[in-house]
């Protein structure tokens, strides 16, 4: 039995044995990687994405992908034997053998093409499923426990969270699949073609010393040396790529700010200022890109020089044996193919290193964001007791981010139907007190708070938020019945009747409506949701005094049992509240 026949018939057993060895090696590597920073960060994200229900499916999918990958390696090995037979048959002028090996080469090509198509489909399937799960984890963590709000209040908040959730997550998944596939392919190919090349190699004489199978030692030595040099050249790219993600996110955020505040910029004629700001941010991107370009050129230049420079070596090293009649043209062809496969496999990490630096940066950004969502619970919070109707604050104190006291000695006791007006200089903590009442103050708060459940508290800010979609979606945000029977009546009451015919029209209502219209939308929400506590933070600042008076009277008439707490500076607000309190002192700023 010829060697190509032995290799062909042993393929099924080889696949099974190699699959088991890959599984065992992967388990050992994952166990050892736990002690490295990279391994801990990767394992942390992986644990979040795997559930007991999905783990079995994922394991089966990965097993199928690895099996197809090993099949590809085996086909590459068989291809070298088929090519050897093809060239040997031409040298021997054996037509029947030539056509047999030509047919077998064609068969290998067809099987490889089918294998690659299925493998590519499984790759994309895993990427899509993983993307769904990781996106769910990231958005859930971001929106849980008001993290989306608290994170932006931190001094060292993660930058460009939207970019981390959308772009970094997708790139991380794609790079992980590419990296794992490349590593498995590299290791298995290195072992397989080292065996093939070992059988083809003769004695290599260097400076009078005979080295058996010298061509194998030659390729290993040179590729390992080149890998260490490439890592040394490319190491700064890890830092540069991390900075590149941050700078691009900052620039995109600046562009969005101009779009979202276009009217204010136009009123101020601030185009030049915005242009200068954007130019400065973009210059920072360009400076960093030049650093990346210089380092990448050095790395790619070295890689190209090594990859192309080593191609002739297998022919040069085997030529003396061909001229001596020890081997045939087919052996030379198989040597060239095996040498190239082995060199590429051993060079995987060297060639992938540039991508790995960007991959490492994305992993750190995702890990940093997820970790920050867990750290939010460390700040001291008041003792909150949920009651049915009343609201009270007992000895409540608020702290700044550095631990200094912002407010202290706050005592309030309000019954159902009571109303309170809070006054005080700007920056003294009036809005912060409302945040603490809603459980949103991120820097620490002490004391005792008794209030209705969170779903019975409605906050009306100075510039209300509207959801994307139709005007009906905007008004009924977040969970008011969109077919509420009193919706149109409430709109008419709040002087928004002229918008009734646009209720189901999709638009950017956050920017379409004026500040005064947005504030009236907030009052419509209050009338429809009928909360037990209404917190108004200068919620009528954009309205004229007659409209303000009308809206407060409507609240009192329609929601007589609701507790109303307002922050405002107008003296006209006094008549709509049972009492007022002053927050802050001369040192509050």
Task: Cite the ranges covered by each PLM segment.
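Short intracellular "coupling" helices and adjacent cytoplasmic loop segments at the cytosolic face
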Residues: 92-96, 125-128, 138-165, 251-277, ...
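ABC-family ATPase nucleotide-binding domain "signature/switch" substructure
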Residues: 436, 474, 505-589
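An intracellular "coupling" helix at the cytosolic face of ABC transporter transmembrane type-1 domains
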Residues: 170-175, 240-260, 266-313, 355-358, ...
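Primarily ABC-family ATPase nucleotide-binding module
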Residues: 157, 267, 367-421, 448-453, ...
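Conserved "ABC signature" C-loop
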Residues: 464-508
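Cytosolic ends of transmembrane helices, especially the final helix of ABC transmembrane type-1 domains
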Residues: 234-239, 243, 247-251, 266-270, ...
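A hydrophobic transmembrane-helix motif
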Residues: 67, 71, 80, 111, ...
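Membrane-integrated ABC transporters
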Residues: 1-79, 84-105, 119-123, 149-187, ...
């Amino acid at each position: 039995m010829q060697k190509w026949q032995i290799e062909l018939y042993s393929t099924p057993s080889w696949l099974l044995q190699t699959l088991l060895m890959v599984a065992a090696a992967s388990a050992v590597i994952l166990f050892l990687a736990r002690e490295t920073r990279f391994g801990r960060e990767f394992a942390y994200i992986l644990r979040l994405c795997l559930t007991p229900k999905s783990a079995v499916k994922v394991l089966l999918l990965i097993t199928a992908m690895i099996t197809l990958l090993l099949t590809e390696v085996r086909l590459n090995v068989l291809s070298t034997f088929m090519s050897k037979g093809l060239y040997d048959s031409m040298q021997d002028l054996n037509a029947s053998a030539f056509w047999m090996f030509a047919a077998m080469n064609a068969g290998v090509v067809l099987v490889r093409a089918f294998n690659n198509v299925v493998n590519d489909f499984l790759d994309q399937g895993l990427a899509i499923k993983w993307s769904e799960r990781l996106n769910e984890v990231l958005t859930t963590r971001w929106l849980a426990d008001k993290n989306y709000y608290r994170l932006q209040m931190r001094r060292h908040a993660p930058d460009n969270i939207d970019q981390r959730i959308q772009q970094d997550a997708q790139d991380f998944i794609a790079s992980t699949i590419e990296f794992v596939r490349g590593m498995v392919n590299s290791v298995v190919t290195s072992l397989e073609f080292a065996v093939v090349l070992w059988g083809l190699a003769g004695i290599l004489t260097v400076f009078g010393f005979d080295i058996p199978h010298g061509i194998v030692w030659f390729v290993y030595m040179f590729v390992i040396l080149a890998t260490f040099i490439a890592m040394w050249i490319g190491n700064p790219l890890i830092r540069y790529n991390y900075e590149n993600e941050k700078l691009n996110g900052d620039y995109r955020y600046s562009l969005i700010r101009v779009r979202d505040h276009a009217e204010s910029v136009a009123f101020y004629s601030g185009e030049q200022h915005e242009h200068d700001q954007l130019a400065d941010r973009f210059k920072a991107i360009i400076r960093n890109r030049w650093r990346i370009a210089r380092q990448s050129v050095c790395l790619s230049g070295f890689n190209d020089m090594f990859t192309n420079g080593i191609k002739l070596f297998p022919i040069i090293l085997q030529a003396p044996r061909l001229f001596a009649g020890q081997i045939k043209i087919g052996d030379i062809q198989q040597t060239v193919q095996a040498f190239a496969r082995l060199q590429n496999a051993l060079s995987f990490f060297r060639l992938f290193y540039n991508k790995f630096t960007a991959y490492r940066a994305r992993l750190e950004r995702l890990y940093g964001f997820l970790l920050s969502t867990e750290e939010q619970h460390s700040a001291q919070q008041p003792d909150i007791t949920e009651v049915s109707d009343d609201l009270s604050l007992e000895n409540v104190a608020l702290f700044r981010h550095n631990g200094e006291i912002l407010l202290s000695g706050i005592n309030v006791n309000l019954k159902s139907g009571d109303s309170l007006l809070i006054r005080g200089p700007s920056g003294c903590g009036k809005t912060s007190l409302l945040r603490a009442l809603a459980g949103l103050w991120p820097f620490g708060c002490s004391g005792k708070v008794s209030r209705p459940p969170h779903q019975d508290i409605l906050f009306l800010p100075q510039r209300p938020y509207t959801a994307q979609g139709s005007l009906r979606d905007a008004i009924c945000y977040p969970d008011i019945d969109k077919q509420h029977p009193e919706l149109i009546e409430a709109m008419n009451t709040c002087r928004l009747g002229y918008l009734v015919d646009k209720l189901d029209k999709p638009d950017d209502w956050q920017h379409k409506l004026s500040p005064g219209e947005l504030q009236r939308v907030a009052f419509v929400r209050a009338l429809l949701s009928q909360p037990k506590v209404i917190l108004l933070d200068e919620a009528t600042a954009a309205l004229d005094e007659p409209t303000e008076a009308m809206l407060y009277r409507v609240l009192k008439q329609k929601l007589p049992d609701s507790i109303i707490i307002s922050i405002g500076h107008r003296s006209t607000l006094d008549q709509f509240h049972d009492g007022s309190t002053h927050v802050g002192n001369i040192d509050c700023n």
